[in-house]
Amino acid sequence: MIKFCKTCLNPSTRPNIKFDKNGKCYVCVYESSKKLDFKYKKYEWEKKNREIQSIKEWAKKNKTNSNYDCIIPVSAGKDSYRQAFYVRDVLKMNPLLVCNSYPPEQLTTIGAANMDNLIKKGFDVIIISLDPVVWKKLYRFCLKKHGNMMKASEMALYAAPVHIALSYGIPLMFYGENPAHTIGEKHGELTGDAIGIRKGNTIKGGPLNLGFKFTKKSDYFFYNYPSLKNISRNNLKIIYLGYYIKDWYGYKNAKFAINKGFKKRTDKPINTGDLWGFTGVDDDIRLVNQYLKYLKYGFGHVTDQVIEAIHQGFLTREEAIKIVKKYDGACSQKYILKF
């Protein structure tokens, strides 16, 4: 039987989730810590600011044969926009954006427009397009074998930018949020250190443990997360940027992105299983995958959204329950047939 966090709606079926002795998930524990007395909060954020400034200075001094201070993996989604502008305009760093692109027929029109808009804001972007034949075979295989057609592609989304950082001698890479703080999936430190991301539910084990028969090494190179030994030898730091931004929330990131020209979905939640239409707009297959997640684990993307809404005070737990019952796991047949 599924159990839920006592203060939000985080389910016990979420991979790698933990609850404390009071029945609270890591997200609620973290959010509670942000609401402590003013002096403590002020001290904590001053400490985080000193830490990210120190990381910035370290990166600028340790880049080798590169004009770039850091890499930011991007999809041109709401979080990508927030990270790119924060790193360039607030931290005053020179980032190289790395996008692991979908095959053309999979990329949505909105997704392409959002990427075009981001590039035009003055960023250098490397776009990696993996072999679409292998990509599609992996989608089909992962759906049948793992019930998650995006399992392999998510490996590439996380691994490919690390390969670029190592190849270009760029010492620092930023991911967005620590999953333990946003959805309660703990697979590493509860800090800004992102080296533990390789233990995440979807990407752990790597492509060679999928059960898929690759014909040559180049077929899986960008799906394979570099070893800790290789990362350490090249002195690469991997950081959760969201840990250092006080108002890092998906909804606020979306508002920021929209002000920069980001476009969101216009379809209704009953068709998409997405309350606000600003998540994963570059790919419609994600909607089907969230539906499958709902069938497997008993929760979908709406649950993730209301957890954040509860913490921001947009919804009460009781209101969130009604919304989840109405929209979670929704997916129009048009998206299923498109897949």
Sequence positions of predicted segments:
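Nucleotide-activated chemistry modules centered on ATP-dependent adenylation/adenylyltransferase
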Residues: 1-69, 86-339
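Hydrophobic positions on the alpha1 helix immediately C-terminal to the Walker A/P-loop
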Residues: 82-83
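Short, glycine-rich nucleotide/cofactor-binding loops
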Residues: 70-79
